[in-house]
Amino acid sequence: MEPENWRRDALVAAVELGGGTVCSSQEASALIWAAPEKPELIQSYLSDNHDWVQLPFAGIEPFIDSLDRKRLWTCGKGVYSPAVAEHALAMVLAMKRNLTAYARSTQWDEGVGSNLFGAKVTILGGGGIAEDIIPLLEPFKCEITVIRK
């Protein structure tokens, strides 16, 4: 598990819970990359004995130059989608109802905001998050358009 960072304790616990052992990168047959913000460093940690590399999030674009056919590369695709979709829906509802203004207000006034019900919703990207948010929007009877490549 490299490089050293604030996620280490949680990742070590997950590896051990799954029956694995955490050892030095030079001894390991697998590498769990723990620093999504430092893709440029991964090459310096890769070793010939690594037959599997786990990347930290769904998108692999920052690591594209490091990918090879010598080892199995996996990522977090689908892991975060349900939680991100739920959070996105919460943010849309907060925005539509102007909750930030009401949270600071000291008195009730005429409501400002709009309904999500029946709204036209455009989703940019058709990946896992889009797939998970669409069912969450269905009860609101939205007209949904997904734009993808």
Regions found by a protein language model. Give the residues of each.
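N-terminal glycine-/charge-rich "phosphate-binding" loop or analogous flexible N-terminal tail
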Residues: 1-30, 37
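Short beta-strand/turn micro-motifs composed of small residues
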Residues: 2, 33, 55-57, 125, ...
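Short secondary-structure boundary/capping segments
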Residues: 23, 64-65, 112-114
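Rossmann-like dinucleotide/phosphate-binding beta-alpha-beta segment
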Residues: 112-149
